[in-house]
Amino acid sequence: MIENLISHPHHIKLVGDFFNKKLFSSISTDHPLVILTDVQVAKEILPPIVDFIHSLDYTVVPLSFPSGEKNKTWETFISLQNQLIDHDIPLGSTMIGIGGGVVLDMVGFLASTYCRGIPLFLVPTTMTAMIDACIGGKNGINLRGLKNRLGTFYLPQDVWICPEFLSTLPKKEWLYGISEAIKHGCIADASIWEFLHNYGDMLFSSREILSEFIKRNCLVKAAIVAKDPHDQHLRKILNFGHTIAHAIETLSQGCLPHGLAVSVGMMIETKISLESGIMKNPALLEQLHHLSKRFHLPTTLEELRDLIPQHLHHEFYDPENIIHALGYDKKNLSKKAIRMVMMEDAGKATSCNGIYCTVPKMAILYEILKSECYAMCNN
C-alpha cells in the first residue's frame, strides 16, 4: 500500500511496506544512492534495507553517525561531508535519511549544502519524526550547545512514512512523539485532543488508528507550513512549548529527550499564557495536564530530575540560568526580549498582530520558573 497523503509543501506518502520497488521509481540508478542514518538505526534495520536497494541495481553508499542530540554537531557534519567527498559522490546523486528527528535534521542540512544541493528523500522511523520532523524542510545542527543554530530550509522530494518501523522502538519512545501531537491540538486543531482522548489506548494496538493519527497530525503541520514555508509568521506557532524546551535541552547538555522537554515546555508556556491574560480559561491548563499524564509525559521540571546528570542539577534548576538560555532562542530580536508562542484557547495560538509570538513580562516568566525550580529543590 502506498497512499499519497500530502502534495504541498512537498510530497508525503503513507507506506504499508517499505520494501516496494515502486517507491524508488523516481530515483535514477545512474548515480550512487547515499543512505544516512545513526548507528542505532543502522544496527537495527539497515542491513535488509541496503540489500533490498542493491537488488534494484543501485550503488548504495551507507553512512552513519553516533546517535543522539549530543552528536548533532558541526564536527559530525564536517565528518559526513568529508565522507561524501571520499566516496566521490557526484552531483545528481540522491540522499535518503532514515531515522528520527536528529537524523532528519542532519541529512537535510547535509543534502542542502553538498554540491549546493542534491535530491533528498526522508524515511522517518520515530513517532516524533513521522508527525513533525519530516514535514516542512527545516534542518540544522547545534553549535556551541545551541539548538539548530546552523541550518537551512530544504524541502525533500518525497517523504515515506512507514508505521511498521515504530515496532522496532520501545513504547516509551512512541510516547515522546505524542507531545508533538498534543502541541498540534493546543495551537491549531483541538480535535487532536479529542482523538487522543477517544482512541489513545488503541494507538499501540490498532494499525488503522495509528495510521489515522499520523495522517491527522501530518495534515495539521503541512497546512501551517504551506501558508508560511520560511517561518516568517504563522509557522512560528509550531514553536509552542519549544522555547522552554530548547532552553532546558541546552542546560541538560543533550541528556533530555526532545519530546519530554516539549511536554514540560508546553505546560510552562501555558501557565505563562494564563498569567499574561492571553488565555482566559484556567481549565485548559488542567486539561493539558491530564492529557499529558495519560501518556506518561512529564509536566514539571521536577519530573525530569532523574534524566539530568546529578552534577548538572544545580545549574539546571536555576531560573536565572534558564532565562539566560532562553536569551539565545532564534525567535528573539534581542536577549532581553524573549519571544514565545502563547496559547489563547484549545486549538488556537494567539496571533499577536500577525507575528504569532510575543514577549511575556519578565516578572511573570521569572516567577513561574522560580516556582518550578523551587518545587524541585524542596523535594
Swiss-Prot record:
Keyword Acyltransferase annotated: no
Taxonomy, superkingdom: Bacteria
Keyword presence, Nuclease: no
Cofactor (UniProt): NAD(+); Co(2+); Zn(2+)
GO cellular component: cytoplasm
Matches recorded under SUPFAM superfamilies: Dehydroquinate synthase-like
Pathway membership: Metabolic intermediate biosynthesis; chorismate biosynthesis; chorismate from D-erythrose 4-phosphate and phosphoenolpyruvate: step 2/7
Catalytic reactions of this protein: 7-phospho-2-dehydro-3-deoxy-D-arabino-heptonate = 3-dehydroquinate + phosphate
Binding positions (NAD(+)): 67-72, 101-105, 125-126, 138, 147
GO biological process: amino acid biosynthetic process; aromatic amino acid family biosynthetic process; chorismate biosynthetic process
Enzyme class, first EC level, given as a word: lyase
Keywords: Amino-acid biosynthesis, Aromatic amino acid biosynthesis, Cobalt, Cytoplasm, Lyase, Metal-binding, NAD, Nucleotide-binding, Zinc
EC number: 4.2.3.4
Residues engaged in binding Zn(2+): 180, 242, 258
Comment on bound cofactor: Binds 1 divalent metal cation per subunit. Can use either Co(2+) or Zn(2+).
Protein location: Cytoplasm
GO MF terms, alphabetically ordered: 3-dehydroquinate synthase activity; metal ion binding; nucleotide binding
InterPro entries, sorted: Dehydroquinate_synthase, DHQ_synth_AroB, DHQ_synth_fam, DHQS/DOIS_N, DHQS_C
Its job: Catalyzes the conversion of 3-deoxy-D-arabino-heptulosonate 7-phosphate (DAHP) to dehydroquinate (DHQ).
PANTHER family from the UniProt entry: 3-DEHYDROQUINATE SYNTHASE (PTHR43622), 3-DEHYDROQUINATE SYNTHASE, CHLOROPLASTIC (PTHR43622:SF7)
Family label: Belongs to the sugar phosphate cyclases superfamily. Dehydroquinate synthase family.
Protein name: 3-dehydroquinate synthase
Originating organism: Chlamydia abortus (strain DSM 27085 / S26/3) (Chlamydophila abortus)
